Amino acid sequence: MNQYYTSNDHFVLVPAIMLALFGCAILLLDTWIIPNPKQRKYLLLVFVLPGLALTGFSLWRQQSFLAESGVSEITAFQGSLTVDGFALFFNWIFLIAALIVSIVSYKYLDIEGEHHGEYYGLILLAQCGMFFLATGTDLITLFIGLELMALCFYIMVGFLRGERRSNEAAMKYLILGAFSSGFLAYGFSIMYGISGSTKLGDITAAVAARDPWDPVVFLMMATTSIGLLFKISAVPFHMWAPDAYEGAPTTITAYLSTASKAASFAFLLRIFLGPLASVRPAWEPLLIAVAIATMTIGNLAAITQSNIKRLLAYSSISHAGYMLLGLIAGNATGIKGISVYILVYTFMNLGAFLVVVALRRKGIIGEDVDDLSGLMHKSPGYAVLMLVFLLSLAGIPPTAGFLGKYYIFLSLIETGHYMLAVVATLYVAVAIYYYFRLVRSMFVGEATEKAPVTSSVGLRFALAASGIMTLLVGIYPEPFLQFAQRSLLK
């Protein structure tokens, strides 16, 4: 399983081609051919779903080829793209998130009065950028993928053009995102200067031949880390996340908090387990400090929030801290733990935000904690699903969230990071407290709005699927653990 197979370049690129073609087709049709806003709704059925279906089919073909041929990876474009278990694992996560968000957006955009075709086009183009982040093994490929994804999210965060907070969030995200990309580009330029190549394999060998405490190597590590830590909203580069999560359409917040975070972690793992692997003595103490600060700020700030989206934003920040612990451990259990965590986090976080989407109705924004009051009495199904998602986010068995935290904590114990494991456990207790605020509001609070929550068939399907997966992964984890095991970088 250690051999390489260099295929027809287009075989590797087919998923990205499908996403780009359908995404651009939607943008062109929306601009020139479909001026009627009511007809734009059908772009979802005619272009988005077929585009995602063809993307899924091409990923399945790549996965089948790897299984049948016995090769460990497929390379293309002289090593700039690599399809392996790692890339396929993350690309399936991106596809699932894009599919769920697209399905639930149909009715949500009706309520917001913002049915514009570019919404769906940007979802597909953002996923195209994510494909390059998971598959890229070249600095140029990775940077192009990152910027394509980021540019799409800058626009989607500000999609509610009539709302000041949406415009403000997009502007903050754009400015800070561009600033972080500058740091990342500077770090990449140093990598190129050290190695004379943009290929990750060549850079890894060149950096390994140098002293980890060489000032040039340390500067490369520091600037690259700043850019990467911003993308996963780690402290102290997290300032954009609460505003972006609150200001964006809730469906986009769900997409940003799951698919974008997964893509950013795929990027981070490619770099830290590749070019920066030999510099571990320099970055490990810094990453420990960042992880502790991220868990601290994320969990403590969430306690004071009255807006559900901001609360979940700080929760998302704290989860980034937990995932960083797996990288700090650095063993196979830790990296597997990150993969498992990202998989389960996708379903439980999507589900939590979809409940907020369900609360949104004409005249009711549905984002305050008080909007959950009495939900058990008027819409028990939604309350039970939200309970499942919150228990999973807190890491309570038998939900999937427990599995993710278990492997992260196990990796810390295996590598002797006992104090980190204790600190992380204490912050789990803090998280249980603020998640319980939402549970108490749903089950004990008095309903301010007596009418039951109504939603589209697509939203109900997405919520049910997310809830089932959140429980299934926790109760019967074996196939999902095998799936995550195949994602380990060789």
Task: Show the residue positions of the predicted features.
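Alpha-helical transmembrane segments of multi-pass membrane proteins predominantly involved
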Residues: M1-K490
